[in-house]
């Protein structure tokens, strides 16, 4: 069963609304990006061969998504520099291989926009983002959410803590 929903994606001082579909399964749910991914690619100057990890978290009843580059963008080769620019009729294409996203034919980014890279550490490399979540873990998360709501920390303070606790001072949140 597919259920449509949307989330807010904050990218370099821009707020995009992404359309997602949730596929309910027996013990877990899978979220699939339904549209507006091309806008994310073009606004961030993602290039072919660049490895990116996709993170998401919930806060204040909203779903947030962050793109974290795993390695610096490869230096362009002479063949790429001499290749003709892509035409508007060929939009960016995204393919999925394991837990890494490879981006092809990204448009050039405006000069005013900046993306600051996040350096990967050992904790990120061993994390399997595609691992299934057991029902026991899901119940634990629900109880943690209930405990958080009954704590003395306000939602605003907790949201600020979430933003400050993201790894690396050069990270960006969507």
UniProtKB/Swiss-Prot annotation:
One GO CC annotation: nucleus
UniProt-recorded name of the protein: B3 domain-containing protein At2g31862
Gene Ontology molecular function: any one: DNA binding
Recorded superkingdom: Eukaryota
Residue ranges the UniProt entry marks as DNA-binding: 1-71
Entries under Gene3D superfamilies matching the protein: DNA-binding pseudobarrel domain
Keyword set includes DNA-binding: yes
Keywords (A to Z) from UniProt: DNA-binding, Nucleus, Transcription, Transcription regulation
């Amino acid at each position: 069963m597919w259920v449509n929903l949307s989330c807010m994606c904050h990218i370099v001082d821009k707020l995009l609304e992404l359309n997602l579909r949730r596929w309910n399964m027996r013990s877990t749910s899978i979220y699939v990006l339904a549209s507006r991914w091309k806008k994310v690619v073009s606004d961030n100057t993602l290039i072919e061969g660049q490895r990116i990890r996709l993170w998401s978290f919930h806060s204040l009843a909203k779903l947030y998504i962050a793109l974290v580059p795993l390695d610096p963008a490869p230096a362009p080769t002479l063949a790429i520099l001499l290749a003709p620019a892509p035409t508007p009729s060929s939009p960016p294409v995204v393919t999925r291989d394991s837990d890494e996203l490879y981006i092809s034919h990204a448009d050039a980014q405006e000069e005013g926009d900046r993306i600051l890279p996040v350096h990967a550490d050992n904790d990120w490399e061993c994390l399997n983002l595609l691992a299934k979540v057991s029902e026991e873990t899901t119940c634990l998360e629900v109880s943690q959410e209930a405990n958080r709501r009954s704590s003395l920390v306000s939602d605003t303070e907790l949201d600020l803590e979430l933003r400050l606790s993201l790894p690396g001072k050069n990270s960006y949140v969507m």
